[in-house]
Regions:
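Signature of N-terminal electron-transfer/Fe-S-associated modules in redox systems
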Residues: 1-174
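Flexible, low-hydrophobicity surface segments
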Residues: 163-268
Length: 268
């Protein structure tokens, strides 16, 4: 195979990029905008979550690259070529169980979307410092992660538990007034509980949104004829196909999702 060197790493010619993921050599298309897309869309590795790509602000997509915690939506494939990428799928079973138990027992998650990325960063710090990892130091590293559920206190409790090698009991049964573990906490902590964007059912179709080029205009007609002739297109849905409400919004329902004939566009 013909190869060339980019920043000291090996990348193959012909639109493919070679590197290792969880100890296994992989070759992915160079068309992906960043490492996260290659992991999720081509390799079907979904523990790294997409919360804000390509902004790199939320930390949900954190992986290890040569042992260092990196947000994968900020890494071009050229920079990853020839290197070793580790996701939670590739972490040892003992470590996985330790993190899952700690986050479940400490109540260190609620929705769980951000936690897999936090676990990866915690692993990087524990690998480096072990039981000597200080709570305030780990708190500083969590500045790279956004969590709107927990307030971080119980996240730090869970990380401290793992760093010290402790094994707290996980209470799974009880009644009113009993402190119990969150449902599916262990799966959520490791990124093994699928969210909508993680699902890959057989024969799944993908939707593409088409917007008008005019910020403010009256819709006179919608012609889907040409779109239906495009290769791979199964159907085209417009406002007339939606029997329910067509407006949405955070405070007021003032954002049109699908605009019917006779309606007005209102995009800034």
């Amino acid at each position: 195979m013909t190869t060339e060197m980019i920043s000291g790493a090996e990348t193959s010619l012909g639109g493919r990029v070679n590197f290792k993921v969880n100890g296994q050599p992989v070759s992915v298309s160079s068309d992906h905008p960043h490492l996260l897309a290659a992991l999720r869309e081509e390799l079907n590795i979904t523990s790294a979550k997409d919360g804000c790509s390509p902004s790199g602000q939320c930390g949900c997509c954190t992986v290890l690259i040569d042992g260092k915690a990196i947000v994968s939506c900020q890494q071009s494939l050229a920079k990853v070529a020839g290197r070793e990428v580790t996701t939670l799928e590739g972490v040892s079973q003992a470590e996985r169980e330790s993190f899952a138990n700690a986050f479940a027992a400490c109540g260190g998650l609620q929705c769980g979307f951000c936690i897999p990325g936090i676990v990866v960063r915690a692993k990087a710090q524990i690998d480096k410092k072990g039981a000597a990892l200080k709570r305030e130091d780990m708190a500083r590293h969590l500045g790279a992660h956004l969590c709107r559920c927990t307030g971080y206190v119980k996240i730090l409790d869970a990380i401290e538990t793992v760093a010290k090698g402790e094994n707290k009991p996980v209470i799974t049964t009880g009644g009113l007034g009993t402190r119990m573990v969150k449902k599916e906490a262990e799966l959520l902590a490791l990124g093994d509980r699928d969210y909508i964007d993680d699902l890959r059912p057989a024969s799944m179709l993908h939707a593409a949104l088409v917007f008008t080029k005019h910020a403010r205009a009256k819709i006179l007609t919608i012609d889907t004829t040409q779109a239906l002739l495009e290769p791979g297109v199964e159907t085209v849905l417009t406002a007339k196909d939606v029997p329910g409400e067509l407006m949405m919004g955070i405070i007021y329902k003032d954002w049109p999702v699908l605009i019917p004939v006779g309606g007005f566009t209102s995009y800034a």
